[in-house]
Amino acid sequence: MVRVRFAPSPTGFLHVGGARTALFNFLFARKEKGKFILRIEDTDLERSEREYEEKLMESLRWLGLLWDEGPDVGGDHGPYMQSERVEIYREHAERLVKEGKAYYVYAYPEEIEEMREKLLSEGKAPHYSQEMFEKFDTPERRREYEEKGLRPAVFFKMPRKDYVLNDVVKGEVVFKTGAIGDFVIMRSNGLPTYNFACVVDDMLMEITHVIRGDDHLSNTLRQLALYEAFEKAPPVFAHVSTILGPDGKKLSKRHGATSVEAFRDMGYLPEALVNYLALLGWSHPEGKELLTLEELISSFSLDRLSPNPAIFDPQKLKWMNGYYLRNMPIEKLAELAKPFFEKAGIKIIDEEYFKKVLEITKERVEVLSEFPEESRFFFEDPAPVEIPEEMKEVFSQLKEELQNVRWTMEEITPVFKKVLKQHGVKPKEFYMTLRRVLTGREEGPELVNIIPLLGKEIFLRRIERSLGG
């Protein structure tokens, strides 16, 4: 059975790059009738925060990427928090030491740093070996460690050989002998390094495929060597392309919003974000672009992942969001849009009126946060607009003639035509002025939609105010 995992570190909000990785894993698991596992890699004690764990899970749920096993739902391969698995890592490190594949190091971190700087100053690569650390392994140093309650670090003996990775996306990648030296797998604070914890977890959780960003490609050499040391076949690797900003540089905060939470707060829909992220580094067999989650699952395959960097285009995401927004049932749209109106200080009293406003304005909106300003004039009088002198009589007469008319465009339009003809006013100039009087804006939805919805009382009041009444 296919078993994949998404393993974020709770050091910040869920980045769109991480969300895309989670999405590809989720789609592959669902397509192959496998399991999608959430594992929290929280061994970086200084940067990990419980608050971010909750936020990460909240963002994944919002996107609809629900996991089969994880910290909150449990499973047969837990615990799913690395901080709760420390004893497991120690046992596996000790096993490697016993088998002669790893060794204890009694050097302090600053001594190791000194060695590193010395090697660099001599123009050598900072590669470590067991012989280099032997001078620190003395009875005095061991006693010191014991008295201070410290544990020796554990270093893995890197075999001197080539390793070959057959990556689903990158193809054959050869790691040459001597690319790296021995490396630390357990620190002196008793915590595992990323690569070691990752391999132990993937091994014990029976992960079959590792789908992750290609910034992890450099970690793969160490991981392949560790799988070999544990006499386990590595999973299938698929390193997906980097996401770049429109300027061709790695996507970062300088490009604007980059976290799922930020896009949600701006009024993007999960359907749109999922659809858009799926197309960053993957393509539909028939070139389709607008795809539901179900359609993405049924058409997803690893062989359509591209090795080329993907460009994050905010305008395309916005266009896609507009499509989903306009095609959403009005009840759902009203429910999602309401908080944005409240935040903008607009109180919704009449639900049916609110839905009609959304129907009229949604063609001009691409994200939920644009609704309040696009439709504020339906809820509040705009600042009075001065009517040009030559049109004051037109508006005064209209105000009188429309008092007793039934409020439908079928009844209102003939009155407009009659009054304009009497005064010889061009319709274009009149309607532009009328729009400004009613909405305070130069453009917006069609007046034939605005006028009936505003109602007679508001229509006449706004004309009265602009006439200086």
Swiss-Prot record:
Which positions does the motif 'HIGH' region occupy? 8-18
- Pinpoint motif 'KMSKS' region by residue range: 250-254
Q: Which organism is it from?
A: Thermotoga sp. (strain RQ2)
Main location (coarse class)? cytoplasm
What's an example GO cellular component term for this entry?
Answer: cytosol
Write the lineage as a comma-separated list. Answer: Bacteria, Thermotogati, Thermotogota, Thermotogae, Thermotogales
Name-wise, this protein is Glutamate--tRNA ligase 2
Q: Which example biological process does GO assign this protein?
A: glutamyl-tRNA aminoacylation
Q: Which residues bind ATP?
A: K253
